[in-house]
């Protein structure tokens, strides 16, 4: 499919918003008294996770999960698979799930359900991008970077068939007539 990528959210805007999210998260957890774990959902969240964890000024651990509901195309599937689980125990800890983009909410709902069974002290979600118009499952999201329209986006860790993760901005994929 011939396509091009148009800048939707520039790099500077992303950096500024992540700094603000870091301040909000720090404020929320600074007096918790519990250990905190940021759980990045791979692969898409890796850039966001790296930048966000430097902005959160509360001592925290970092762990990762891989959950997938995407094939190689441009739409989500309802089937959610856990491909990599956490390495650490989260019982009694403040857990913040860090996601790149929330679309249908199916993947995040499943991950949240799995993690809640492990008895964390608290469980919250932070996403860089939110597509509320695509939501099929109501998932509580405490920290949102940007709400965006129903566009297929890439960049800043988000891919299209494993391409474009390297872009420093969020771009909109535009299909071209062939």
Swiss-Prot record:
IMP binds at residues 99, 103-108, 131. It is found in: Cytoplasm. GMP binds at residues 99, 103-108, 131, 159. The active site is at residue 103. The keyword Transferase applies. Gene3D superfamilies: 3.40.50.2020. Its cofactor is Mg(2+). GO terms for biological process: GMP salvage; guanine salvage; hypoxanthine metabolic process; IMP salvage; protein homotetramerization; purine ribonucleoside salvage. Inhibited by the product IMP. Highly inhibited by nucleoside phosphonates, which are product analogs. GO terms for molecular function: guanine phosphoribosyltransferase activity; guanosine tetraphosphate binding; hypoxanthine phosphoribosyltransferase activity; identical protein binding; magnesium ion binding. Purine salvage pathway enzyme which catalyzes the transfer of the ribosyl-5-phosphate group from 5-phospho-alpha-D-ribose 1-diphosphate (PRPP) to the N9 position of hypoxanthine to yield IMP (inosine 5'-monophosphate). To a lesser extent, can also act on guanine leading to GMP, but shows a highly less efficient activity with xanthine. This is Hypoxanthine phosphoribosyltransferase. It comes from Escherichia coli (strain K12).
């Amino acid at each position: 499919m011939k396509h091009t990528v148009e800048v939707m959210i520039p790099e500077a805007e992303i950096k500024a918003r992540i700094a603000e999210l870091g301040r909000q998260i720090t404020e929320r957890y600074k007096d918790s008294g519990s250990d905190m774990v940021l759980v990045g959902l791979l692969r898409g969240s890796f850039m966001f996770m790296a930048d966000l964890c430097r902005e959160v000024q509360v001592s925290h651990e970092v762990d990762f999960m891989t959950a997938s509901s995407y094939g190689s195309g441009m739409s989500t599937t309802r089937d959610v698979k856990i491909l990599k689980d956490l390495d650490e125990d989260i019982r009694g800890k403040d857990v913040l799930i860090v996601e790149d983009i929330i679309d249908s909410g199916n993947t995040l709902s499943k991950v949240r359900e799995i993690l809640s069974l492990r008895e964390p002290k608290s469980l919250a979600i932070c996403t860089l991008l939110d597509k509320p118009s695509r939501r099929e499952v109501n998932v509580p999201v405490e920290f949102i970077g940007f709400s965006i329209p129903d566009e297929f986006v890439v960049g800043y860790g988000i891919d299209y068939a494993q391409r474009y993760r390297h872009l420093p901005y969020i771009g909109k994929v535009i299909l071209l007539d062939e």
